[in-house]
Amino acid sequence: MFPISSTCRHAIAGLAVALVLAGAVPDTRAQMADPVHPMDALTYDEVNRTVALLREAGLADDGTRFPVITLKEMPKAEVLAWEPGEPFTRTAFVVMREDGETSEAVVDLTGGRIVSHEARPGAQPAIMQEEWDRARQATKEDPRWQEAMRRHGIEDLSKVSCAPMAPGYFPEEGFGKRRILRVPCFDQTIPLHPMQNRPIEGVLAIVDADTGEVIDVKEAEPVVVPDTAPGYGPDAIPARGPMKPVLNLTPGGSNIELEGALEVSWQDWSFHLRADRRSGLILSLARFRDKGEERLVAYQMAVSEMFVPYMDPDPAWAFRTYLDAGEFGLGYLISSLGVGTDCPHQAYYVTLLFPSDEGGMFKADRALCIFERNTGNPAWRHYDAGSGRLTSRPEVELVVRTIPTIGNYDYIVDWVFTNRGSIKVNVGATGFDAVKTVRSPDMEAETAGDDTEFGALVAPYVVAPYHDHFFSFRLDLDVDGPQNSFVRDLIVPEPAPAGSLRTSLWRLVSEPVGTEGRIVPTRNTHGEVWRLINPNRRTAMLKGHPGYQIEPGTGNTLSSLPDNDPAQKRAQFSSTRLWLTRYKPDELYAAGDYPMGEADRGLPRFIDDRQSIENADIVAWYTLGFHHVTRPEDWPILPTRWLGFTIRPMGFFDRDPSADLAPEFARPPSREDATQ
């Protein structure tokens, strides 16, 4: 996990969202200064007004930094009752940092007043660019660090780059509430891509991010940095010849409709998008049009947290237990998308604005893409052998994609909408492995056993330590409205009735879940179905309670760390596949609001009071993850590894909503049509 370059954060004074259809002139339909929807992100003008009001109240000055300036949403009932064109209130939630102290404020933008201001002693917000820069500079200027580097054979310190990292949370170290960063460095004598593939082992600085003081320089036995370590790109690996074009085109135009800031409609789906510095993207008010009725499926969905602990006990590695959303920010580190490579040419590419540390905004060009794709698979099909008749329909999906780049890792986050009424949530992990320099050139070396005890040799003298990736998704599903119940259907084998040709079968045993808590698979069953239902409504024809299922896919691994491990204490969400809580508007993050400086927060606290969730407003928290057992094929670039789950209708409709799909696509307009 490495910091961003300050050049990636452009101060702007313009529009908050700009839509660009690849190959076309930038679209003039852009979000203006005034929000048009109560869930719209704070605009440029609103961020400026927020900071101005705080300054006028004497709560902020030139030394104040703003790790959080975000929308404080209206009450859910008011949002659901709102109709387009009606007025709505706007409120900002702000976290401020100055002189080593953290405080929170709520600012009423409609009324132009400060609603509240509260000190948060000891709270550690996400790392800011100024802190990365300060720690990097302080490290390289420290005489102890310079001497240590020379003892490790590094003479030209101008060819060394340093990457301050989140420190982990280890109270026994004695740093108290000091805001520290740990700073490893890399040999840049030989220009390579990636730059971090020549780590300098045995030197680690610990820096106070508030003051720039280098608290300590940890030094261990030197490990000689190899002359070369394979990278990627044209200088390292010549590209093969190009393939013939394989394209996903929309010659008849797009089926996607975009309105307002980021209101999306596609086929029977509609939903709202909002850029968010911490979660990256927040998806709200997902509705499916069923026989003319706009039926609510989800009030809000987003990535809540990510946990990436490394499994190497080396002091320079054991602290690497990152909480990427809470410590860095998936929106703060969002990356620009490559046209035709990260997303298809015909996608809508959206430039987003995010509030900056200084209280302005920065621009992330092409940070979001929205596109439809023909998967090449049938949505459904059947061949009748008797008549020889084949009936099938093409599968087309809508994809909403962002790719935050958190240091060495790029995470492709997809929300995929289908004509079947399902939402697929997929994450693709790519980028490159974080590596350490070792003594072994190959697996026949005497030192290979020790060097590869906690990782795999991926290149001569290069080991990629084993690690985990866990993602917590906050799913505020509101099936036909906020009042829902949760049911777990257990697949239970049992003997067949007497006289049956069979000796055994299975049946479904439904168990309502009445209180908040963890959903732990029940023993002596052969699987479970998890679903939320609306007990206050019945479907038109079959008279069942409409429901949606949360269906696991790939990436079902859970954390193997014990609860008392310091890393696990900050990320307890990763030990359980599914958590259920009663909706509270301030319970947003699975590891808590300030996970960089505290443990035992978030979901374990949310469920402490064991509130009823029977016929209540329920939030589901789904954990996706995998153990990354590294291998040579992961180097020098990591092939994308996909994992995901599906939110699919279960009794929500009276039939398959894709049954009426057209057998073929509409004819694209001809040149003659265009001239008429």
Question: What do the PLM-derived regions correspond to, one by one?
Answer:
Residues F2-G14:
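Bacterial N-terminal signal peptides that target proteins for export
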Residues D61-T110, D156-D208, Q267, V400:
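Exposed beta-strand-loop-beta-strand "reactive/processing" segments of non-cytosolic proteins
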Residues P38-L80, M128-F170:
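Short, non-transmembrane alpha-helical segments in secretory-pathway proteins
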Residues A11-G23:
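Bacterial N-terminal signal peptides
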Residues T28-M32:
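Boundary at the C-terminal end of the N-terminal hydrophobic targeting segment
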Residues L109, I114, E118-I127, R150-H152, ...:
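Extended effector regions of multi-domain proteins
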Residues F2, L21-P26:
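Domain-scale selection of a single, long terminal region
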